[in-house]
C-alpha cells in the first residue's frame, strides 16, 4: 500500500478487518495498460454482438468505455484516488448531530454492471474530531465509483467515517433505484431500495436514531 495516503490506508485496513472490502485481486497493471487491455477486449465483445466498429459512431466506443471504467465509474477500486481528508479537532465543542442529506449516489451494480442511482444521507455526533462537510460527499462518491452491492456500500461509508472520526457514532442510509431491476429482468420502474447502517449511539439510543431518520423526511 505504498504511495497511499494515511487516510486511505486506515480505511482500507478497517474494511478488510471487518470483511467489508469489495472483492478485489491486486495487480501491478498500470492505468494506461488497463485501459489498453479493456479497449482490446471491448472490441471483441462489441464485434461478437455484430456491431460495426468501423462506423464513425462506434469506432471510438471501446476506447471511451475503457477510459470511463478506469478513470471514472470504477476509479474507486484504486485507493490512490481516495479523497484528501481534512479532520480537525473539535475545539468548538460541537455536540449536536451533523447531518448531510441528498448526497448524489451514482454507482454500478456488480452483478450486471448497470447503474445504481440514488441519494445518501450521512450523520455523525462530533466527539474529538470534526470532518470537512464536502469530505463526506467525496467519501460517498469514492465508494460509489466501483462495482457495488448497496448493502456493502452503505457499510463501507459507515466504517470509513468511523475510522477517520475515531468514533462509532455514525449513521448512513441510501435510497436507490437499481437498473438491474428497472431495465431488465422484472423491469420494475418504480421500486426503490433502502439500506441503513447505524453505529454507536445511533444504534443504541432510539431517540438519536429517530432524530436522524425523522430529519430525512
UniProtKB/Swiss-Prot annotation:
Residues where Zn(2+) binds: 109, 112, 180
GO function terms (MF aspect): GTP binding; GTP cyclohydrolase I activity; zinc ion binding
Keywords (A to Z) from UniProt: GTP-binding, Hydrolase, Metal-binding, Nucleotide-binding, One-carbon metabolism, Zinc
GO cellular component entries: cytoplasm
S-S bridge residues: none
A single GO BP: tetrahydrobiopterin biosynthetic process
Pathway: Cofactor biosynthesis; 7,8-dihydroneopterin triphosphate biosynthesis; 7,8-dihydroneopterin triphosphate from GTP: step 1/1
Keyword Aminoacyl-tRNA synthetase: no
Classification via PROSITE patterns: GTP_CYCLOHYDROL_1_1, GTP_CYCLOHYDROL_1_2
Enzyme Commission (EC) number: 3.5.4.16
Catalysed reactions, as listed in the record: GTP + H2O = 7,8-dihydroneopterin 3'-triphosphate + formate + H(+)
Pfam families in alphabetical order: GTP_cyclohydroI (PF01227)
Top-level enzyme category: hydrolase
Subunit structure: Toroid-shaped homodecamer, composed of two pentamers of five dimers.
Record family assignment: Belongs to the GTP cyclohydrolase I family.
Protein name: GTP cyclohydrolase 1
